[in-house]
Amino acid sequence: MSEVKLAAEPRTEFGKGAARRIRRESKVPAVVYGHGAEPVHITLPGHELLLALRTPNVLLSLDIEGKAQLAIPKAVQRDAIKGFLEHVDLLLVRSGEKVNVEVYVHTEGDLAPGAYLLEHVLSTLTVEAEATHIPESVTVSIEGLEAGASILAKDIPLPSGTTLAIDEDAVVLQVLAAQAEEAAEEAAGTAEVGSEA
């Protein structure tokens, strides 16, 4: 897991006008929550934060008035049209502390020969991991799977120290027969019924 250091500045102005002024200065308004403390309002450097958030579940080392604190992103608000960062909520974490996070599910390998489709029922898994060792993603093999096969949450290998935080029998991936094959089978079935009459 990567750790990104960011210099944070305390924020005393609030509201839409203040947020716009902050963003015009290429900064992003943010709020840091956690550990029973009062929320801390800060601004973060926009470009560095944008680059950091490209890594899923990035661990941020924030320098807030000379005090280093670890945090993970909890909520990221983006402009719906232009995509720039509008606001970020961060959760304070400590080394050794367990947190629940969403990790992306990636696949490797090829399905069995034939026109099969892989459906991602869940694109992410909720897992519990140590705050400083959060996996960016998990990978599962789909090599040779045929129509009707499914992969459950418990079938996905997790890194050491990471556990599932969802029902282990939740379907994550399933293999479907291609629509063209199903349509051909239905047409053949209808033709047989019609010829019997």
Swiss-Prot record:
Q: Describe, as the record does, how this protein assembles with itself and its partners.
A: Part of the 50S ribosomal subunit; part of the 5S rRNA/L5/L18/L25 subcomplex. Contacts the 5S rRNA. Binds to the 5S rRNA independently of L5 and L18.
- List this protein's GO terms for biological process: translation
Question: HAMAP family recorded for this chain?
Answer: Ribosomal_bL25_CTC
Q: Which GO terms describe its cellular component?
A: cytosolic large ribosomal subunit
CDD domains named among the record's database cross-references: Ribosomal_L25_TL5_CTC
Q: List, in alphabetical order, the Gene Ontology terms for molecular function in this entry.
A: 5S rRNA binding; structural constituent of ribosome
UniProt xrefs under Pfam families: Ribosomal_L25p, Ribosomal_TL5_C
Say if the entry is tagged with keyword DNA-binding: no
Q: Which Gene3D superfamilies match?
A: Ribosomal protein L25, beta domain (2.170.120.20), Ribosomal Protein L25, Chain P (2.40.240.10)
InterPro entries from the UniProt entry: Rbsml_bL25/Gln-tRNA_synth_N, Ribosomal_bL25/Gln-tRNA_synth, Ribosomal_bL25_b-dom, Ribosomal_bL25_C, Ribosomal_bL25_long, Ribosomal_L25_dom, Ribosomal_uL5_bac-type
Sections of the chain in a coiled coil: none
The superkingdom listed in its UniProt entry is: Bacteria
| Classification of source organism | Bacteria, Bacillati, Actinomycetota, Actinomycetes, Kitasatosporales
The family this protein is said to belong to: Belongs to the bacterial ribosomal protein bL25 family. CTC subfamily.
Which purpose does this protein serve, as stated in its record?
This is one of the proteins that binds to the 5S RNA in the ribosome where it forms part of the central protuberance.
Q: What keywords are annotated for this sequence in UniProt?
A: Ribonucleoprotein, Ribosomal protein, RNA-binding, rRNA-binding
This chain's protein is named Large ribosomal subunit protein bL25
Q: Show the PANTHER family listed in the entry.
A: RIBOSOMAL PROTEIN L25/GLN-TRNA SYNTHETASE, ANTI-CODON-BINDING DOMAIN-CONTAINING PROTEIN, RIBOSOMAL PROTEIN L25_GLN-TRNA SYNTHETASE, ANTI-CODON-BINDING DOMAIN-CONTAINING PROTEIN
